[in-house]
Amino acid sequence: MPLNQKILVVDQMHDSIHEVFRGIGLECSYRPDITRKEMIQILPDYVGLIIRSKTAVDEELILKGKDLRFVGRAGAGVDNIDVDLLAKKNIELFNAPEGNRDAVGEHGVGMLLMLLNKLRLADKEVRSYQWDRESNRGYELKNKVVGIFGFGFMGSAFAEKLRGFDCEIIAYDKYKKGYTSDIDYVKEVELTDFKLRAEVLSIHIPLTPETSHLFDYDYLSSFQNLKYIINMARGEVLSLKDLKTILCAGNLSGAALDVLENEKLNTLTSEEQKTYQSLFDHEHTIFSPHIAGWTYESYERINHVLAKKISEIKF
């Protein structure tokens, strides 16, 4: 790769970004506070663009990148990127799910243990000087059937972290077959069996037109033994209104959400506010602000994952 090729970085990245990319012959223009108008104006000067989830790489932006050779997504999801147009323009797309998969797996285990052991309620009560052991009696993860919906980098990482808990792990992935042939701690099942047996549903699918609000009232109601839901994928794949209905009816024991349909909480509609408040007030829900993959270690590791992939481009 020729030296001094310029790339534009428009979102917050770990401080190692300059050193890591300089090591593969790329100079970073680090502009995390850049406006979209500025981005469009200066993009023609760059061969690469590095983004996170807040930047929409759409037709308007792509067509301005006359010398653009690649887009790097610092993370896993690419729902904010016009993937088809990039391919049509022969612009490479790189993401970095390898960089934060361990973080997501660990976060999921933490959320699941909190649900099973009612730690949100127990913590709240003790802080209020209530000492109620019986009402906070929890369940063991051992022998539970944990269903992983989508077995990519994140789903497989969650399965790896569950190995030591003596639970039964089943997985369903519509677009993969034989993905458990070399591992003995996960059973690959068809959707019918998955819905019949899963007690815990952990969602690990990308947001696409097909998966948008896939998990609605009817879909969730088709599960026969479902007790807990964990979503660390994309908020829009799960209908929170329908989740609220099922949860408040007592048909679920708990839900842990790292992602929401609308994560800009100051823009909620009145209907969304009612739904969110009902879920926030529920004793058996746990929330985190889209941080499952957001650890100090993953923050730096993502730089190295992207750099390694980008270094293989033939300029």
Description of each model-found segment:
Residues 1-94, 196, 216-221:
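An N-terminal-biased, well-structured beta-alpha scaffold segment characteristic
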Residues 26, 91, 186, 284-286:
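Short, conserved active-site loop motifs that form the nucleotide-linked donor/cofactor pocket
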Residues 23-24, 134-225:
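Rossmann-like dinucleotide/phosphate-binding beta-alpha-beta segment
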Residues 91, 97-145, 157-160, 164:
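Phosphate-binding beta-alpha-beta segment of Rossmann-like dinucleotide-binding domains, i.e.
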Residues 226, 232-315:
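Rossmann-like dinucleotide-binding domain for NAD(H)/NADP(H)
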Residues 54, 76, 199, 205-207, ...:
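Short glycine-/small-residue-rich Rossmann-like dinucleotide-binding loops
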Residues 56, 77-80, 99-100, 145, ...:
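Residue-level detector of alpha-helix initiation sites
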Residues 62, 66-69, 81-93, 203, ...:
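Beta-strand-loop-alpha-helix segment that lines the small-molecule cofactor/substrate pocket
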